[in-house]
Every structure is written in C-alpha cells, then in structure tokens.
C-alpha cells in the first residue's frame, strides 16, 4: 500500500508516563468536579462518584511529579518520531461495549492524551454485533495535520 512498517521499542520514560496517567487524570477530575463532589455528591452518577472517591488521596506534589514525567516522555517520544512518519497502534484492546454507558477501555489511547499528541482513530473493520474496531495514527505534539493525513492514507489502504 506504499508504506513500510517496523516495530519500535519505547523508552522507559514513556512506559512510566503510561503508568502515571491515572495520577494526572484523577487529580484533574477531582479538581474539575470539586464543587459537585462537595455539594451534590449523591446526585452524581455512581461511576463518577467512585472515580472521584478513588482520586481523593492524590496530592498536588503527586500531580506535579506526574507532570514532570509526562513532559520528559513527550520529549522522548518526539525523538522517536523524528525517525518515523507516524505511529500506528490499536485504538482499544477489543470491541467497544454495547450500549452507551461507556466508550470502552481507554488504555490504548490514554498515553497519547496525557502527552497531548494527536491521535486519529481509523475504523479497521466491523466486528460481531456491528461494532467497530479501529487503529490509531499518532504523530508528534503539534503535528495534527500530519496525523489527519496519515489517517486518510490508512483508511484508503484498508479499503
């Protein structure tokens, strides 16, 4: 299809960023919902309440340390992306759940969200139950147009 593919090994700092993603996400969620958590706890959806309950123990120091790891990981990923046009990864570990209660398991895109790198989902095939399964094109921070172009290329190649 006009592309060469190779496997890449990510530096340990990128793996560490993936591990600390929840610190950033949960701390920021707790900050964003602080008023609701304090004033309207019982009116909040149960899943959100549980997540906010689980995030109460993170401190500002935990958050800042995690942000330092994320910044180092973004720099390391930028170094890798100097040698390749795009990273290609699965969008999720399986088919999405049925219904609208959840978008599914986010673990395959949470790193890119943390690092602020563009990632574009491309439907790869339709699984049983008419549920989509996708891949994602990931490019360097700020290279949004490149991610969109790569997604278009992948979409054409998968037709």
Language-model features: locations:
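Short helix-loop capping/hinge segments that flank enzyme active sites or metal/cofactor-binding pockets
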Residues: 4-6, 23-74, 78, 123-134
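Gly/Ser-rich, acidic/histidine-flanked active-site/gating loops
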Residues: 1-20, 57
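Short, surface-exposed loop/helix-turn segments at secondary-structure junctions
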Residues: 21-24, 64-65, 91-111
């Amino acid at each position: 299809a006009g592309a060469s593919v190779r496997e890449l090994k990510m530096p340990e700092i990128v793996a560490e960023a993936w591990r600390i993603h929840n610190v950033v996400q949960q701390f920021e969620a707790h900050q964003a919902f602080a008023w609701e958590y304090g004033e309207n706890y019982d009116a909040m959806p149960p899943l959100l309440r549980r997540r906010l309950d689980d995030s109460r123990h993170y401190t500002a120091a935990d958050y800042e340390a995690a942000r330092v790891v994320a910044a180092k990981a973004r720099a390391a990923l930028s170094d890798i992306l100097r040698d390749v046009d795009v990273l290609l990864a699965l969008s999720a570990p399986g088919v999405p759940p049925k219904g609208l209660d959840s978008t599914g398991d986010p673990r395959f895109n949470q790193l890119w969200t943390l690092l602020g790198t563009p990632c574009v989902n491309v439907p790869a095939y339709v699984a049983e139950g008419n549920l989509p399964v996708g891949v994602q094109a990931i490019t360097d921070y700020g290279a949004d147009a490149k991610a969109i172009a790569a997604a278009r290329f992948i979409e054409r190649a998968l037709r």
